[in-house]
Design a protein with these regions (language model features):
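Conserved Radical SAM active-site core
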Residues: 82-100, 104-159
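Flexible, acidic/Gly-rich N-terminal and inter-domain linker regions that tether
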Residues: 1-92
């Protein structure tokens, strides 16, 4: 028996390839993938949307900071920042983390004081967007790596 697919860590093409092993035809697999990311629902029992729970959130003005706790007990912090775009429309930028802690050692940075604890995998990085969109209820317009960690030190997961 095949184990459930954790869709958050897969590209669309990776998911489609693996969904075929579960007997899904390409159109159905595409619908499952779209539903997972657009509506936040798993349409099949063999698909999981496993993500770290949000254990804390803080709102200051229109800015929302939220903390997700991973299976190992370590936490990541993400921030949704509202701003007006060039055309005057409201946008939301999500600052995501690529690591827990950081090895850079910058004296001005609180995260650097922790040292590097571990890299996040692609699923944990995408789970920050998923948490903002489906748990917090604010779909980001832009995403930047300005949370915890140095994205260039975790390129395999970032890309």
């Amino acid at each position: 028996m095949l184990s459930p697919l954790d869709i958050l860590g897969l590209t669309r093409d990776e998911f489609l390839d693996r969904a075929l092993a579960y007997g899904a035809k390409r159109p159905r697999a595409l619908a499952i993938y779209r539903a997972a990311f657009r509506q936040g629902v798993a349409l099949e029992p063999w698909v999981t949307l496993r993500r770290p729970p949000i254990v804390n959130s803080h709102v200051e003005g229109d800015t929302i900071k939220f903390v997700q706790r991973h299976d190992d007990g370590l936490e990541t912090e993400s921030v949704l920042i509202p701003m007006f775009g060039r055309a005057g429309q409201m946008t939301r930028t999500l600052c995501v983390s690529s690591q827990i802690g950081c090895a850079m050692g910058c004296r001005f940075c609180e995260t650097a004081q922790m040292g590097l604890m571990r890299n996040l995998d692609a699923a944990a990085i995408v789970a920050q967007w998923f948490g903002a969109t489906h748990d917090v209820g604010e779909r980001p317009t832009n995403i930047v790596f300005m949370g915890m960690g140095e994205p260039m030190d975790n390129l395999d997961s970032v890309l």
